[in-house]
Every structure is written in structure tokens, then in C-alpha cells.
Amino acid sequence: MPIVIEQSARGERAFDIYSRLLKERVIFLVGQVEDYMANLVIAQLLFLESENPDKDIHLYINSPGGLVTAGLAIYDTMQFIKPDVSTLCVGQAASMGALLLAGGAAGKRYCLPHSRIMIHQPLGGFQGQASDIDIHAREILAVRDRLNKILAHHTGQPIEKIQIDTDRDNFMGGDDAVSYGLIDKVLTHRTVTAA
């Protein structure tokens, strides 16, 4: 893990790179969305809210997706906390990663030029007694409907279009994701603020 040395009036302080970025209100969501990673992201969101509830949080996403329950825990926290959560796809935001990208604050959802975004219906499998398979089949259909409603809410697309478009893997580049309503803008360079 890279270490960053910061100079201050009190001397030097060493940070791992992610801790240093957290100090700037940047959270990285990288890799599979699973329970441990979700807990870390949620803890960082809550910590940054407690530090300053009025300042935006920046969530950088590079994820192939993962567990629906873990992803929805992150999503619910993003919606629950007071600060706006700006989302930025760097690399890919697929499946649950795409839902989290779309769940950023309106007007503050971005991707870089060569990012790849993919939406689809939830995946699942189960074996066991027929009655248990039936229970799990109904549950995955209910989860699919819940995820489609979230996407419809954040994209402005009709639920019927979301249902069709998520029936199979649906890949988009940045411009297509803007047109679809998953993000607000493709960023090609960082804006420079006047001194």
C-alpha cells in the first residue's frame, strides 16, 4: 500500500493513500461488492457525515458488482446521510456498481471517458426442496422489481423500459449512460478553480 508523507507545523505524518484521500472526503469502492467492503464504505460515509454534514462526499467506483444486500446497504446509507454523495465511475460500474453510480446526488454523477457501465437483472441460484426453490424464486423476482424501481427513480426512465433493458446484460459507454440518465456528465479533465 503506498504511503503519503504530509508536512505540517507539527512535523511529518504518514498516511496510507486511502486514508489520505479519505481526509479529502474521497471514498473508493473497488472490486466485488460484498459485506466486508460494504461495511467499510458505510463506516466511511458515516464518519465523513459526522465530520461535516454539509460538505459533499466523493465516491469513486470501479466494481463488477456483487451482493445485492451489501450493495443496497451502501445505497440506503448514501440516501440516508445529509451530505450529497457525488459518484464517479473509474473503469467499470457493473450490476450493483451501476446502481450505486446512478444513486449519487442528482447532477453529481460522473464517469471518465473510457468507463464501462452495465445494468442487468439480479443473478441467483438455489437448490433444495421444491417449496424452498419457490420461495427463493419469488424473492429474487421481488428483488429484481425493487432494483428496477431504484433505477427508474434515478434515471427518469419508465419502469417498463428498465425491465426490458435489464433483462440481459446491457453495456453502455459514458455518452450512452448520460442519455439513459445513469450519470450526468462524462468528465474528460479536472476543472481548475481560480486561486
Curated annotation (Swiss-Prot):
Residues at the active site: 95, 120
CDD domains noted in UniProt: S14_ClpP_2
Q: What class of enzyme is it?
A: hydrolase
Which reaction(s) does its UniProt entry say it catalyses?
Hydrolysis of proteins to small peptides in the presence of ATP and magnesium. alpha-casein is the usual test substrate. In the absence of ATP, only oligopeptides shorter than five residues are hydrolyzed (such as succinyl-Leu-Tyr-|-NHMec, and Leu-Tyr-Leu-|-Tyr-Trp, in which cleavage of the -Tyr-|-Leu- and -Tyr-|-Trp bonds also occurs)
Membrane-spanning ranges: none
Gene that this sequence comes from? clpP2
GO CC terms in record:
cytoplasm; endopeptidase Clp complex
Q: Name one GO biological process term.
A: protein quality control for misfolded or incompletely synthesized proteins
Source organism per entry reads: Methylococcus capsulatus (strain ATCC 33009 / NCIMB 11132 / Bath)
Q: In terms of domain of life, where is this protein from?
A: Bacteria
Which InterPro entries does the UniProt entry name for this protein? ClpP, ClpP/crotonase-like_dom_sf, ClpP/TepA, ClpP_His_AS, ClpP_Ser_AS
Q: What is its EC number?
A: 3.4.21.92
Q: Name one Pfam family in it.
A: CLP_protease
- Main localization is cytoplasm
At the highest ranks, the source species' classification is: Bacteria, Pseudomonadati, Pseudomonadota, Gammaproteobacteria, Methylococcales
User: NCBIfam families from the entry?
Assistant: clpP, PRK00277.1, PRK12553.1
| Location of the protein in the cell | Cytoplasm
Report the family membership. Answer: Belongs to the peptidase S14 family.
What's this protein's name?
A: ATP-dependent Clp protease proteolytic subunit 2
Which keywords belong to this entry? Cytoplasm, Hydrolase, Protease, Serine protease
Record flagged with keyword Hydrolase = yes
Q: What does this protein do?
A: Cleaves peptides in various proteins in a process that requires ATP hydrolysis. Has a chymotrypsin-like activity. Plays a major role in the degradation of misfolded proteins.
Q: GO molecular function: any one?
A: ATPase binding
**Assembly and binders:** Fourteen ClpP subunits assemble into 2 heptameric rings which stack back to back to give a disk-like structure with a central cavity, resembling the structure of eukaryotic proteasomes.
